[in-house]
């Protein structure tokens, strides 16, 4: 049964809770190093730092507390925001980045690498709660956990009987315990918080799916901007970011030689495409599993073998899930794998790999090799190596995407926050950023790469029916 006594109480006297404040100077230096690689954010500071469109607004962030995110926080701060921040993954925080932001005073930070699930949801609620008990005006979300917490809070206040139930999912039970404590203290709190939220900008595919589900069900409580499907996010962060950070995570964790290995990539969306390119680039033979005939055909025509997971488990040396779905690699799949196959996930949540099977099946034994690297001996007698407990391998075992590609993503996030802050006419639905802004985000990053852009003549522009200033493609163009 749900029990408020299990939930750790909030401590609103805290300005931060991080692993080690002595890392702040290291974080500050690393932050300076990223500036040149994040031209989009630096330009937004120059453009909007004077007018401060976020002045007086409270912003909650639930997004990986990395050096790149520290630059996003700095940008929002320079635009006038009052910020509280938590990470959106228990393993993704870079402790020196969290310390640097906490020391700077730009945001109240509640994040450290290696949180428990109880810690994680405490940090999320701390980020959603100001010292006077009020909530945010704006949300920056990655995976939708801050949005989920508010929506579940309102749902519980409308139907307190939900708090009398027990839940099989451990993490969901932790959420409900926290909401039970909040309900005991103030049974109308989350309805007041939700009513004040001007909107959320959502960073990733999984969180966007949640938003569209809420919209379709008529349950979305405030406007939302889908940042993930901006071209300069999905076609860059998801593809080129994963192309570099996947290999970084696998190699830091295992020191494995990828060349000559068979790598199985589950899912061939933008993330899967980047993963497949990465592993092929290191000399692996890449197999792809897919449910979508279009993506499957794309993979086949790029030269990848497309097969089922049931077939792939027989030959794979390294497995990467990139689907955003659940139970992609099941217990039966793991039992059939080669001895010491490496299994990891680069989707947002930890349910793509059936960790519940490993943790709850008699005969499955875990040996921790080092942080975020576990050797599981299975009932078959063989072993597999699971990275980051099935959570994001690139952030759990490495430092995530490079600064340059995150500059494009976070420039979109900042523009979305400005839109939510300044447009009072937005309804309770999911919006996307206009093509003109997408092109501007790309334009801001060209000089850093030495790109020289060709300009249309008036005759050429008239011939194809566009302005010489853009936008150059219709909204339905897929890139």
From Swiss-Prot:
Binds 1 NAD(+) per subunit. The keyword NAD applies. Its cofactor is NAD(+). It comes from the Bacteria. NAD(+) binds at residues 204-206, 238, 267-272, 290, 325, 346-348, 394. It catalyses: S-adenosyl-L-homocysteine + H2O = L-homocysteine + adenosine. InterPro entries: Adenosylhomocyst_ase-like_sf, Adenosylhomocysteinase-like, Ado_hCys_hydrolase_NAD-bd, NAD(P)-bd_dom_sf, S-Ado-L-homoCys_hydrolase_CS. Keywords: Cytoplasm, Hydrolase, NAD, One-carbon metabolism. It is an enzyme of class 3 (hydrolase). One of its GO terms (biological process) is S-adenosylmethionine cycle. Its EC number is 3.13.2.1. CDD domains: SAHH. Substrate binds at residues 66, 142, 203, 233, 237. Its main location: cytoplasm. GO terms for molecular function: adenosylhomocysteinase activity. GO terms for cellular component: cytosol. Pathway: Amino-acid biosynthesis; L-homocysteine biosynthesis; L-homocysteine from S-adenosyl-L-homocysteine: step 1/1. The keyword Acetylation does not apply. It is found in: Cytoplasm. May play a key role in the regulation of the intracellular concentration of adenosylhomocysteine. This is Adenosylhomocysteinase.
């Amino acid at each position: 049964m749900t029990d408020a006594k299990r939930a750790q109480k909030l401590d609103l006297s805290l300005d931060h809770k991080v692993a080690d404040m002595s890392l702040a100077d290291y974080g500050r230096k690393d932050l300076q190093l990223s500036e040149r690689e994040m031209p989009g954010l630096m330009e937004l500071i120059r453009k909007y730092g004077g007018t401060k469109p976020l002045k007086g607004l409270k912003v909650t962030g639930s997004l990986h507390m990395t050096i790149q995110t520290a630059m996003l926080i700095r940008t929002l701060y320079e635009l006038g925001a009052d910020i509280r921040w938590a990470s959106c993954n228990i393993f993704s925080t870079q402790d020196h980045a969290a310390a640097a932001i906490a020391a700077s005073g730009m945001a109240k930070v509640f994040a450290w690498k290696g949180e428990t699930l109880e810690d994680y949801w405490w940090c999320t609620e701390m980020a959603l709660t100001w010292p006077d008990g009020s909530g945010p005006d704006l949300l920056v979300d990655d995976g939708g956990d801050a949005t989920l917490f508010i929506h579940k809070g309102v749902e519980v206040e409308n139907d307190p009987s939900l708090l009398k139930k027990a839940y099989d999912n451990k993490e969901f039970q932790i959420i409900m315990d926290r909401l039970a404590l909040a309900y005991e203290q103030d049974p109308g709190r989350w309805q007041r918080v939700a009513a004040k939220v001007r909107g959320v900008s959502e960073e990733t595919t999984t969180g966007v799916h949640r938003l569209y589900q809420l919209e379709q069900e008529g349950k979305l409580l405030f406007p939302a901007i889908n940042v993930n499907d901006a071209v300069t996010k999905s076609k860059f962060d998801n593809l080129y970011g994963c192309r570099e950070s996947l290999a970084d995570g696998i190699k830091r964790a295992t020191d494995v030689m990828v060349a000559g290995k068979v790598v199985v990539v589950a899912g061939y969306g933008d993330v899967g495409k980047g993963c497949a390119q990465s592993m092929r680039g290191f000399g692996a033979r890449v197999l792809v599993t897919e449910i979508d005939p279009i993506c499957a055909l794309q993979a086949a025509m790029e030269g990848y073998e497309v097969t089922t997971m049931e077939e792939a488990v027989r030959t794979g040396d390294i497995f990467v899930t990139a689907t955003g779905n659940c139970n992609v690699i099941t217990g039966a799949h793991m039992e059939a794998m080669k001895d010491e196959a490496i299994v990891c996930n680069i989707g947002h949540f930890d349910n793509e790999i059936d960790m519940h099977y490993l943790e709850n099946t008699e005969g499955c034994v875990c040996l921790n090799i080092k942080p975020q690297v576990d050797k599981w001996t299975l009932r078959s007698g063989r072993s597999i190596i699971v990275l980051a407990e099935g959570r994001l391998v690139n952030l759990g075992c490495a430092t995530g995407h490079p600064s340059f590609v995150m500059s494009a993503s976070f420039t979109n996030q900042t523009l979305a926050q400005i839109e939510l802050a300044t447009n009072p006419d937005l309804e309770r639905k999911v919006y996307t950023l206009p093509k003109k802004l997408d092109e501007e985000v790309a334009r801001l990053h060209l000089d850093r790469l030495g790109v020289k852009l060709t300009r249309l003549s008036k005759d050429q522009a008239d011939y194809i029916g566009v302005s010489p200033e853009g936008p150059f493609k219709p909204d339905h163009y897929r890139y």
